[in-house]
Amino acid sequence: MKKITLLTIVALLSFGANAQSLLPTKYGIKVGLNIANVTSTPNEGVDNIETTPLLGVAGGFYMEIALNDKWYINPELLYVQKGASFNYDYTHKWDSIGTNQTNNEDKYGTTNSLKLAYVELNPTISYKASDKLALNFGPSVSFLISEDFVPIENIIGDNPPQNAVENKLATYASEDLDVGLNLGISYYLTENFLVDAKVNTGFMKIGAVNKTTSTAKNGNERIEKVFELNNRAIVLSFAYLF
């Protein structure tokens, strides 16, 4: 019994020492600019996809946990704006019921705006190469809290669309979770003030632009999904530590 009690005390003391070593050595706030974009995988009938980065804000809480004099864990909890503006052309294929009109086509060009807001958790691992410079890497877990998708379509060519009634505007089907990877560097201007730059690459599909590009009448295959999207971003930020 005495041995068990002694071992328990030693284990508790050891756990307490390890837990104390994982307490944050510094807390801080981080504010910056997020240069966001998306990558896409188009389906049949979709052409000329062009994306334009969206500028957003990124900010939240930041801390440093020293493992030793070189290695740190730097968790972040941030509000981040992502998304992009993107254009694409597509062909709307349709057949007429009860007539001999088959394989008809209308060509459209589109302009789209997608704005997303996330709460992002970044358990970053940091290696201090010097007193001023640190190399950072780690996973990123993002939870979607809001979205805004605005599609605009225009017919390509001089002729009006023959089947505009059935050609509905595109919709966006979002995913609530995104998991990715952060790679970056930090430069300490002072002991408590640093500049941070990182690249974020999302691994999961964040959503899909849905659009009926073939009505599937008279035996044709119905095509509804235009393309799926993934997040990409460059983040430039400042952090102040207390």
Q: Residues of each region from the PLM?
A:
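Bacterial Sec-dependent N-terminal signal peptides
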Residues: M1-K30, F238-F242
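Transmembrane beta-strands of outer-membrane beta-barrel proteins
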Residues: K30-G32, E76-L78, G138-S140, K198-N200, ...
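Residue-level signature of outer-membrane beta-barrel architecture
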Residues: L33, M63-I65, I125-Y127, F143, ...
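Outer-membrane beta-barrel "beta-signal"
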Residues: N34, Y187-F193, E228-F242
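Extracellular/periplasm-exposed beta-strand and loop segments of Gram-negative cell-envelope proteins
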Residues: N37-L54, K82-L116, L144-D178, N182, ...
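Membrane-embedded beta-strands of outer-membrane beta-barrel proteins
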Residues: G59-F61, L121-P123, L183, L236-F238
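Repeated loop/turn-to-beta-strand initiation elements of outer-membrane beta-barrel proteins
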Residues: W71-I73, K132-L135, N192-A197
